[in-house]
Amino acid sequence: MTGPIVTLRDITAETVRTICDLEPYEAQSGFVAPNAVSIAQAHFNPAAAFRAIYADEEPVGFIMWRPWDDSASCFLWRFMVDGRHQGKGYGREAIALWLESLQAQGYRFARLSYLPGDRGPHGFYLAQGFRDTGETRANGERLMELVL
């Protein structure tokens, strides 16, 4: 018996409210912006792309990315799995799907930033193959990179 199939899907007028209602655990809320804010920001950044994360037919998370400062890298701008759906492998599978799509588009690097802290995403990203670059942004976020 296999688990649910994880997919990345467009967010539509019919699904946007459901996606905006997804939230990480309360203790994680300071690490990622609400999905509604992310979707609004993406509409003002023509290079941004975003998708809902589904497990079978159930929305379980959100992912957003954009090209980095060079043409070889793509930046994971936002990533979240609803608290009710964490620990089921959906996040790991969603990142794998995203990385596969980057490779298919010719990117050579995936980059992201995170805020350090308890219950933060650092360990999760390490487990997906990302490595710390040693760089820290002005807002305190630390950068990670994965060679595709």
Set out the residue ranges of the language-model regions:
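Acetyl-CoA-dependent GNAT
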Residues: 3-77, 81-84, 95-97, 101, ...
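Conserved beta-strand segments that form the floor/walls of ligand-binding pockets within enzyme
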Residues: 75, 80, 111-113, 143
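Glycine-rich acyl-CoA binding loop
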Residues: 87-92
